[in-house]
From Swiss-Prot:
Keywords: Actin-binding, Cell projection, Cytoplasm, Cytoskeleton
Protein name stated in the entry: Actin-related protein 2/3 complex subunit 2B
Subunit structure: Component of the Arp2/3 complex composed of ARP2, ARP3, ARPC1/p41-ARC, ARPC2/p34-ARC, ARPC3/p21-ARC, ARPC4/p20-ARC and ARPC5/p16-ARC.
Coiled-coil annotated residue ranges, if any: none
Chief location category: cytoplasm
Gene3D superfamilies in UniProt: 3.30.1460.20
A Pfam family it matches: P34-Arc
Taxonomic lineage from the root: Eukaryota, Viridiplantae, Streptophyta, Embryophyta, Tracheophyta
Tissue: Expressed at low levels in all tissues with a relatively highest expression in inflorescences.
Family: Belongs to the ARPC2 family.
GO cellular component: Arp2/3 protein complex; cell projection; cytoplasm
Molecular function, one GO term: actin binding
GO terms of biological process kind: actin filament organization; actin filament polymerization; Arp2/3 complex-mediated actin nucleation
Amino acid sequence: MAYLERASPTLKETLLKIYRAEKPIEVDQHFHEFGSIEYHIKYSVSDPNIVHVSTSTLLETQGAVTLKEISSYTYEVIKNIGVGVIDIVDPPRLGFQLTLGLNLDNIPRGKEAIKIITRISELQAIILSSQLKEMLRSLNFQDDSRSINNMPIRIVYHPSEPFYVFKQPEKITAVFPMNFKDNSDVVIATSFFQELVEVGSQKDMGKAPQCSWSPIPPLQLRGEPVQDLTTNSGFVSFDITSRHIEGKRLDKTVWNLLNFYACAKYHIKCSRGYIQRRMRKRMETLVKLLNNTSLEEEAAQNENGRCKYVKEFVKVPKGKLMMKQRCKEMTRRVKISKFRIKINGCARFRFNQRWISLPKFSSKPSDKSYTKLD
């Protein structure tokens, strides 16, 4: 998949290293970028004036339009990067899509050299953009009466990031199935896409392609591979009209489509990092407050000594004090009543509303007590 920076970092670094070397160095480097873009750089001491750069893209398309080779228009754009500097090698290196021969002697010195090398490092961005441009042009000028032209085109620039383009009346729709590994990223992405749709519907964004999000795939994608239609973050669609692919707008539209996956993932990762930083900062603030509170309590204990514990022992909470008073009052009433017991069953004996007192027993003998006779 294309990325936010047009220039390949590894390709640019290697070419600058070869260009700035005081003596020719042997270079035979083979590397991949983003899983689908392949490069090979060959520089030999025996031929110090020529650097061979080969590149290839995993371009898979299914549908009404299929591009397997680089067009003549793309060749002209590549040659115009540096007139007299770039030669296209025919046939290309085995297993690659394009091979360029760079003449180091024809590269101008100073800042212009860095500019040309940077443009050469944008080779894959130029190829990918040109291929997608031709697809959009071919779809735009097709006849709507032919039903086969409305079939979706599956475009794969990265094995795990395919997207679809299909023709509709007066517009072209690009659909991006979105998948994320982390559950937190899924939550952030879902909220982000819904917010994107809401912002895109405002009047200020009337010139931009209309954006829509749905948790289920569009009807036009029926019959496509199940792995593409199984997502955890839904499907994002952009409606591209004829005004978006006219003149210089075509370059911007194509580049935005190629970089949508990269932009979305970049935004979500940044949002996740921001949330984590805020949570960490909040946690540090709470811990600091707790530490300050414990330090203040220890300082107060050291100043007051034992007085604090005496005050705490004497001080009684208001609720407990009221309960204690009620208990005292109840005890006083019980003592006054002399343990009188009310018997409701004696009402028929005219003892209604009367009280029977329990006799008092004493362990000391009295004068009225009985004496056992011998």
